[in-house]
Swiss-Prot record:
Higher taxonomy: Eukaryota, Viridiplantae, Streptophyta, Embryophyta, Tracheophyta
Membrane topology type: Multi-pass membrane protein
Species of the source: Arabidopsis thaliana (Mouse-ear cress)
Subunit structure: F-type ATPases have 2 components, CF(1) - the catalytic core - and CF(0) - the membrane proton channel. CF(1) has five subunits: alpha(3), beta(3), gamma(1), delta(1), epsilon(1). CF(0) has three main subunits: a, b and c.
Function in brief: Mitochondrial membrane ATP synthase (F(1)F(0) ATP synthase or Complex V) produces ATP from ADP in the presence of a proton gradient across the membrane which is generated by electron transport complexes of the respiratory chain. F-type ATPases consist of two structural domains, F(1) - containing the extramembraneous catalytic core and F(0) - containing the membrane proton channel, linked together by a central stalk and a peripheral stalk. During catalysis, ATP synthesis in the catalytic domain of F(1) is coupled via a rotary mechanism of the central stalk subunits to proton translocation.
Gene from which the chain derives: ATP6-1
Note: The atp6 gene is located on the border of one of the mitochondrial DNA repeats resulting in two identical copies of the mature protein with different propeptide extensions.
Transmembrane parts of this sequence: 154-174, 220-240, 249-269, 276-296, 316-336, 339-359, 362-382
Family: Belongs to the ATPase A chain family.
PROSITE patterns: ATPASE_A
Name of this chain's protein: ATP synthase subunit a-1
Signal peptide: none
Length: 385
């Protein structure tokens, strides 16, 4: 059913031009609407009168008047938005492929008479906002508490909020299983879970890091344990609907991987001094090949930190995007008023459930991979492998 606007006999013959005063009435609320197109947050009105939902048969598609009206609609949208690109998008969203002259004329008249507050313009915002919705919107960082300090801008975002929630949950969990927090000799379910994770990471450190006594290995254990639990809880928290996946952002995973890798490099220098650079040149390498191998090993060593962060970011972002896409597809089919669409949606729905289970496994696996690679890199720095 094609949407059209109410029109009368006078509006069909109207040749009035756009009122430039409408463009000057665009305020900050409209500007905020335009900036929200990509996130699907554009607001709009849905009038209750029947005119906008009426159907009108098309006229001659070769009529030059159709082309004139379509161009006029685009020009009016450009004038209202003061943005040629956005005006083109809104204009095409309104007239689409319609060849209905009264329909197009009513749109042009509404834009002329009512400007940005009119039914036509608000309908364009709705159409563009719905079309611009993206599976990547779930990764948008939204400022919750903006803060300005001089020329610097700081803000407490949704990413900061969920990182604090993760750390708070982690600290409370650790506190409640200690003696001061009420831990029992006979462990309860939470205490058993924490002890299981503790033993798992402890065994990982003992197996992967060689050349050190047990007491020295204990120096690195707290950092590795906290890193593993932080990543594990961040990944699992991202599976909760309407939450935020902290590890789906490259800057966060990159900052974590580089900070840890710099610490590992410092440990290597503390243990070996300048002899630490000897890992760049394996023993027995011919002298002519030495410069190339040193450069190659140096690039390989530096890219360890980059790959460590990219691996986590890419896996979490790709998995969540795929679940979002298939969920939207299944939901659209379920909302169709047709039994065949409903039955056809069962397939994507089962795939979404399977992918959700797979994402839970990926969330745990990526925390494990990140942790074991830290242990391997630390072992290489200590033993110069």
């Amino acid at each position: 059913m094609r949407r059209i606007f109410l029109f009368d006999e006078n509006s069909l013959n109207s040749s009035s031009t756009i009122d430039t005063s409408s463009a000057s009435t665009i305020d900050t609320s409209f500007a905020s609407q335009c900036t929200n197109f990509s996130s699907g947050q554009a607001s709009g009105t849905q009038d209750t009168h029947a005119g906008i939902f009426e159907d009108c048969p098309g006229l001659n598609p070769n009529d030059e008047r159709v082309v004139e009206l379509q161009c006029e609609i685009r020009e009016k949208c450009e004038a209202l938005t003061q943005d040629p690109e956005m005006g083109l998008i809104l204009g095409e969203a309104l007239h689409a492929e319609s060849d209905n002259v009264p329909f197009l004329q009513s749109i042009a008249d509404d834009l002329t008479q009512n400007g940005v507050s009119g039914e036509a313009f608000q309908e364009a915002l709705n159409i563009v906002g719905q079309a611009a919705a993206s599976p990547l919107d779930q990764f948008e960082i939204v400022p919750l508490i903006p803060m300005h300090i001089g020329n610097f801008y700081f803000s407490f975002t949704n990413s900061s909020l969920f990182m604090l929630l993760t750390l708070s949950f982690f600290l409370l969990l650790i506190h409640f299983v200690t003696k001061k927090g009420g831990g029992n000799l006979v462990p309860n379910a939470w205490q058993s879970l924490v002890e299981l994770l503790y033993d798992f990471v402890l065994n990982l450190v003992k197996e992967q890091i060689g050349g050190l006594s047990g007491n020295v290995k204990q120096m690195f254990f707290p950092c590795i344990l906290v890193t593993f639990l932080f990543l594990l809880f961040c990944n699992l928290q991202g599976m909760i609907p309407y939450s935020f996946t902290v590890t789906s952002h490259f800057l966060i995973t990159l900052a974590l991987s580089f900070s840890i890798f710099i610490g590992i490099t410092i440990v290597g220098f503390q243990r070996h001094g300048l002899h630490f650079f000897s890992f760049l040149l394996p023993a027995g390498v011919p002298l002519p090949l030495a410069p190339f191998l040193v450069l190659l090993e140096l690039i390989s060593y530096c890219f360890r930190a980059l790959s460590l962060g990219i691996r986590l970011f890419a896996n979490m972002m790709a998995g969540h995007s795929l679940v979002k896409i298939l969920s939207g597809f299944a939901w659209t089919m379920l909302c169709m008023n047709d039994i065949f669409y409903f039955i056809g949606a069962l397939g994507p729905l089962f795939i979404v459930l399977a992918l959700t289970g797979l994402e839970l496994g990926v969330a745990i696996l990526q925390a494990y991979v990140f942790t074991i690679l830290i242990c391997i890199y630390l072992n290489d720095a200590i033993n110069l492998h």
